[in-house]
Amino acid sequence: MELSELIEVTRVRDAFMRKGPRPAQVGDICIFGHHLIFAPTTVGKEVPDNAEEFWLLHKAVDRVLCEPISKENPQRGGLLALKCKNFLLIIFEIGDLEICRATARTIESLSNINGFLHDYAFFYNSPFTILDDGWSAFDLEQEFARLMLSTDAFRISSVNENFAICPTYPEKLIVPKGIGDDYLKISATFREGGRFPVLSYFHKETKSPLVRCSQPLIGPTNRRCREDETILNSMITVNRGYIIDTRSKSSATAAKAKGGGAEPQGNYRQWRYIQCPIPRQREIHDALTRMVDVCSERKVTSDRWVSRVGQAGWLSSVAASLEAAANVAQCIYNERLEEVPVVIHGGDGLDSTLIASSLAQILLDADARTIRGFESVIEREWICGGHPFSLRNNHCAYAEGTVTGPFESPVFLVFLDAVHQMIAQYPMSFEFDENFLIFLFEHAYASEFGSFLGNCEKEKKDNGIRKKTVSLWSHVHHPENMKQFVNVCYDPTPGVIWPSIAPQCIKIWDRLFFRWQRPDNSWSTPETETIQSLADHWKLREKELIAKASSLRRSVVELSRELRVLSPM
């Protein structure tokens, strides 16, 4: 199929475009295979002050609406509304109603093509020189080499070569060293989707591994798999481990009736079972829809608006994700215990499991709070970890796909919002700022890069994505691009961070939900030099206070000595 076959209208002249509260512009709409381009009309050689050429990927459009300006007088033309996946609302006023409808049909068709083989990423030519190829930036062998500096308890297994055991896992995985591939194959038959236990993270300080997998298929008959038990028990050295289930008790019970379930205590005696529920896919999807609706509401009282924000359920989903991650981190980072293995799973291990495992790493590891370290977490846990981006992100808050509707959910956005909450509470502990998170959100839904294409590594390999497209990380790693994401106040915080999950501490992400409702300059931030100056001032002030505290401690010690000398025996 050629994309040109779907284009009924290639150009619409003299259309009015409105983007949120920004002033309307007059110009031409040009439609190509992958983009809609709005070119403002010039008057003679003069360009209006508010003129802005606007490019929009069709893939970024979530919903298309078309209606006449006046039902009583169709000759006045039509209104074309494009609701985008990044919550931008664009309205075009077109003088001819039939042309407006044809334009709507064209954009509707181009934005809802099944699959991803016609996506722009396959046709994009990078305008910059790739200095650091993102496709090879996070190699498993390199990760394993770093791991070997801390422990020799794991090995690389090629048991999933050609994706023979698990289609959603990569071909190479890090597994416990004393376990043979035959045990892994048997364990795969006992875990949902073949997702047997694999290493996700190793905490150097406490020597505690974080392992993820999917639910065990015990079913109503309490099926048992001794090989799976052996894999988990092989990680027990000194202390009992933890199995953390990201489902609610009712969900785990319902799953057992359908063939799934949770690890029975009688078979996994060296493990403590903990439930840290994160909302399910559908709940997250509906919560975002309600949240976006609330944030676009204008005619409502403050009390009613606050109530609706709470009822939307989005902030509670983010808080639940942070709470689950904090529980994982607490199990791993225990000052009294070392070598405490933690296994985490939900149902299929593709959504809430990845939220908890990746957030826990950011809490525990300062390296994960750098740009490159954060990318590594996303690459390992989400992209290689098998999160089905193409299914989950086919639509966002405004629409549902005819085929993919039941599978769509902004799970990755929950993760990004949770990281945003961490940045809000620890603004100097992250090398990147919220601009980077919004950038990742937008590219996860529509992008000229191939990183988020497909649902797993198998689909990437089958469709040649790594060979035919440019990695998003290649773009980020270019010095000219990276500087826009750097937090100038960054001051590395070693060790663990513990963000509060109290309701009053979980904030609405203004830059995400409200940025299109304000004029362009309302989100302007102080100049970099000003921010840097403030950061330097407070760093200097911190050093002064630390020095003063040390001096006071020395004075206390000296006074204590004098007191002992002067005090009678």
From Swiss-Prot:
Principal subcellular localization: cytoplasm
Localization per record: Cytoplasm; Membrane
UniProt membrane topology term: Peripheral membrane protein
Keyword Membrane part of the UniProt annotation: yes
Keywords from the UniProt entry: Cytoplasm, Endocytosis, Membrane
GO (cellular component) term, any one: cytosol
PROSITE patterns xref list: PPASE_MYOTUBULARIN (PS51339)
One of the GO biological process terms: synapse assembly
Keyword Cytoplasm tagged: yes
CDD domains recorded: PH-GRAM_MTMR9, PTP-MTMR9
Residue span, Myotubularin phosphatase domain: 134-513
TM ranges: none
Signal peptide range: none
Family designation: Belongs to the protein-tyrosine phosphatase family. Non-receptor class myotubularin subfamily.
Function as written in the Swiss-Prot or TrEMBL entry: May act as a regulatory subunit for mtm-6. In association with phosphatase mtm-6, plays a role in endosome trafficking probably by regulating phosphatidylinositol-3-phosphate levels. Regulates fluid phase endocytosis in coelomocytes. Regulates posterior migration of QL neuroblast descendants and the anterior migration of QR neuroblast descendants and HSN neurons during larval development probably by controlling Wnt ligand secretion through the regulation of sorting receptor mig-14 trafficking. Involved in the formation of correct synapse number in DA9 motor neurons.
Name listed for the protein in its UniProt record: Myotubularin-related protein 9
Organism in which the protein naturally occurs: Caenorhabditis elegans
